[in-house]
Amino acid sequence: MQHTTCTEDRIYHALERCLHGLSRDAVSSRWAAGLCLNCWSLQELVSRDAGNYLILVEKILGKAREVQEKCDYDLVMPLALLFYYAVLYAPHIPPDSELLLKAASIYHSFLTWPVPYCDVFRELLTFISDELKAPGISFQRLVRTEQGLPVKNYQSSTVTVLLLNRSEVQSEFLSIAEKLSSTEPPRHATLVLLLEHLYQVTFGTRCDLGSLHHLLKAKTLEELSEIYTSAAEAQEIAAASSDPVLARERLQSALRDIAGAAALPTIAGDAQPRRLQPIPIPTSRCYTYSWDQDNFDVLNDVLSKECSVVEPVASENEEDEEEEEEDVETDGCSPERDSLLSPISSISKDSVYSALSEDGPKHSCVSLFSSSKDSISELTVVSKKSLRSFVSSLKDCMDSGYAEDSDESSLDTLGRPELKVEKTHHKYRHTLTNKIYKLFKSKSQLVLRRDLKDCVDTGSLPLRRAESLCHPQAKPRIPARSRRAHSLPQHGLGQKLQTPQTPQLLSLPRRPFLSYDEDAKVATMRVVVFGSDRISGKVARAYSNLRLKESTCPTLTRYFKLQFFYVPVKRSCLLPAALLMHPPPSPSDLQLRALAQAEPTLAGAESSTNDISHYIGMLDPWYERNVLGLMNLPMDVLCQSAKPEAEPQEDSREQLPILADMILYYCRFATRPVLLQLYQTELTFIGGEKMTEVFIHSLELGHSAATRAIKASGPGSKRLGIDGDREAIPLTLQIAYSKTAISGRSQWNDVEKVCTSVNLSKACKKYEELASKTECLNLTMTEVVKRQNSKSKKSFNQLSVSQIKVDKVQIIGVQSSFAVCLDQDEQKILQSVTRCEISVCYRPRDSDPLALRRSSLTPQDPSEFHSLLCLPISTFSGALP
């Protein structure tokens, strides 16, 4: 196909605009208006003609060579994402073009780059390999997953849930969200689209797409389902083969046979003078909910609607599970978790991780059995239920860097294997080998659920460092600080909050271990939340509450793998919540609206920031460009859509607004999460009651929290009056904080200050601060140096503001109480607080009775390891080094 130089220049210029300003070292102005539309503009330009995708791929590969030569790390991830998009949407890539082979040779050299770049290109090479063997298979899998179309041996499903607060977002956001949730295409049209794409991407212009479209539309849903099932199975078989050339030939032969049997148009032998048609991806299945809670109970409604999709597969697994339980009951062995410590001690920790997370189920099974013959013989002696528990603990270990503790009494039985050998049989040995393969293959979630049934009253098992799996008697070692992704919390002292004079055992927090190769579940739920830092705080508390519920009784996580997406929205231009909850206007409402416009502070101006989204943008520049940048555009621009073609097809779908397209782009291509540290505060009230709350961004104490409560009252705040810190009544506070030094050590300080406000916020707000401990907090104290009495009735304070980076804080009111506000949330303002303790949030472990018993049995162990609780937010590249 021939293209003018003008078209190539336009595509190259659009590509350059997408990459402009992404380098952190580039000296440029802070003006970034409209840059978020560059990626959307490139996609809209390329989609006008099918040949433009090939031009874009060539330009991307040429740019990738330049990036490799210059070692420009900032452009690697955007180029990889753009290449994935171009190949995914390409209607047809001729085999003789060798574009994919050229891309494979270029991207193969990136495997020597550091993490996470090498991981990204490893996945990209797998994507290229699948496209060489089965063209368009990634497109097919994505559409099947988003539309909930099950195919044999590939029954995954993805649903998108949009959570919006009517008092937080504008009405245009609500209309766009409702439009996304109401544009689900019918299954008949989806099957027609998938078959058209499958034949066009495989045969190119040899397939008469117009005739194929009319014949497919005339068929019934049952006929289309049967045709597509056969075609999809042939494509999956081709992707599983090893020879790309042979796989394509067999796939083309199978598709010709299917077309002949279904009376579809005959495939021509040579290319015909036809025009390829770009086929867009249908809108994903979406649900929209109005959400303003500190829990995710609204997601249970999605579970009830989607249970018909996921339940059949779960029932088949449960049947296999019951058969395995019957075998376990006949063995008469007790569930002893530590019985595998000795046989597995010869296998290194890293080899187990790599086998389970990278090589897949079969390779992990082989690596375990190839460790040693003695290990195999000892494995056959162990109870089956112990093995299932061990596999379950390994999966947990992959997610958080921890393995589950177990009962120490099982070590006694481990030292006497002769008592168990007498009970073993040849059938038991053969059956156990098969169970190991099945367990490593797909059923970690079912095993975890069965363990929870057996241990209902024990709570969640405590977490211990993964090294103790292999060496339970090894001396604890403080892990050395290493260079890693900035979003992962660094190591630091984690002892419980106390006075500096009280001695305490050393306690070390452990950063979570991210694993992208988790055992595939039946379905994935994308949870997309819109809002400011106030809403991010609600997400943090809801996530903490969800983890606590799911650890005792799995419901959502039993069927869904949860992915969280965060779209920042400015709150400063919004009206009070009471005005938006009642749509029909009345004369009094109009007066309130006019008052809100005249008094911006009453409408929530500057009442909430977007620091969390800016922090994510520092970690992932592509997120900052394409998601955070949308916040700077006016709504009339975001509500526009691309103009339809001059000659639209007969069944062309309605064009979505720019905001809807970018939301779908974010959900489809952002697959790598960053971890945001959660913090907890233990509050003590005047009556002695205690409460523990979670926050993610900020905690305001004293006058700043009281002022926010007054502003939240709406127009009534004018009667109450809002004074600044100079007019505020000071508080005498005893403040103990752990100050962080450059070396990473912490030093406790105990002071008594007279303050009006004490605020804590996430410390990392600049690129330079990413290299330090990202879980630290900025302690800002507004101290009253001198109180001056004027001739009037009011007194004025002479203030001094100081800021300190801290790990933990303890604040006690001296004969006074104060107010506390979490994450700038007016619904989280707590009054009459006398004591406040703030620290990083850990995963719950103290509720386990086994942990309490072990702590009393082994007091000589001076150190403990805790796993930090972090909120995973999906981004395009994850946290870049």
UniProtKB/Swiss-Prot annotation:
It comes from Gallus gallus. Greatly activated by G gamma proteins. GO terms for molecular function: 1-phosphatidylinositol-3-kinase regulator activity. Residues 312-339, 472-499 are annotated as: Disordered. One of its GO terms (cellular component) is nucleus. Regulatory subunit of the PI3K gamma complex. This is Phosphoinositide 3-kinase regulatory subunit 5. Its main location: nucleus. GO terms for biological process: G protein-coupled receptor signaling pathway; positive regulation of phosphatidylinositol 3-kinase/protein kinase B signal transduction. It is a peripheral membrane protein. Pfam families: PI3K_1B_p101. Residues 316-330 have a biased composition (Acidic residues).
